[in-house]
Amino acid sequence: MAVIKAVSSKAGIGQALDYVTKEEKTEDKLVSGLHCEPDTVKDEMAATKELWGKTGGRTYKHFVQSYHKDEHITPEQAHKNAVELAKNTEAWKGHEVLIATHIDRGHIHSHFIVNSVNYENGHKLQWSKADLQNLKDRCNEQSRQQGLHVPEKGKTFSGEEREETVAVSYTHLRAHETLANLV
């Protein structure tokens, strides 16, 4: 079962690239570049931004494709899947993308660092909820074709019903506590 998510980060692009390419996380072999070379990706992404005069604002988008710890997939196949997803993501056409598959935790996961500036036309990456859903759908189809689990909303990896959880904001929680103290 592979899950795709967009990562919100305050780290600069250099820090993000350094993190995802750490040798102990990737065994120094599960790193690929789409429209860039892994060894020179920082310079290439910076050059694209300089070329088009777009060095400010959001400098990259970060995504992760994670497999459940009990999924039967090799790190090499997970990396191959990630590269295939990146190549076929329409919104990423013309953007440098670094793909790094990590094997240092209990589950295999791949990071995608996407340059925010298109090297062909200088346009900034426009990413919508529909684009993310399309990426998730293609990831699910990839899993289906390989006989891997496909995530089902409200179910665990083994297919059992997940306990219902409720997300509460900190502000809402504090207001609730204040009301309880008044009573």
Q: Model-flagged regions — what are they?
A:
Residues M1-R174:
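N-terminal nicking endonuclease/strand-transfer module with a His-rich metal-binding environment
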Residues H172-A175, L179-V183:
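Single conserved hydrophobic/aromatic residue that forms the stacking wall/gate
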